[in-house]
Amino acid sequence: MTKLLDGLGFVELLDTFGDDLTVVNAARVSFAKESVVMEPKDEKLIKYLADHHHTTPFFHPQLRFRLKMPIYVAREWFRHTVGFARNEVSRRYVDDKPECYLPPPESLRERDANKKQGSKPTPIENATGVHTIIKAFQEQAIATYEALLEQKVAPEVARGVLPQSMYTEFIETGSLSAYARLCALRLDPHAQAEIQAYASAVSKLIEERFPVSWRALIHEAAE
């Protein structure tokens, strides 16, 4: 498990299906061929497939993760739909105490006036004061939520007062190809820093299981 942000967020690899050889044999079936062990020619084939956008062999390997991230990060992550299946904790059914991501003062980045979205790498001038404001707001939101539950308000209604900084947790299964597309976009320097952290953690775990394929895919995406 890789802890992220304030230590409450995480990425955990639960399971994988296949390996680099799975990609090779998915491609070689066109010629009724099969490799038993990885050889240099197989590594060259994987690189060729990635370089020339022959993506279907990379759909066969699958990975399953458990992730915990702030809702506002998750909603960006969930924009990636093709090749993924997700099941998320539902606050219609769960009413335990919420957890929120409280960004440290150095993460309260300044708005970039030259961009429609994004931020400068530098924190705002009054970062410590704003940090205190956010902390107080989160505590009040959670207190209000718990007060609504005490008044017998249904969790599906009471959850409406909770902030986007609240953590959510989900299980996600995706193909190697799908994760390559996701990471290519979310590892970009222009992506939000918080989602870059999750993409980086996922990328490292994938590379450990699919080293040849992942290097080929990420290199191709960076071109």
Predicted regions located by residue number:
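Family-specific signature for flavin-dependent thymidylate synthase
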Residues: 1-223
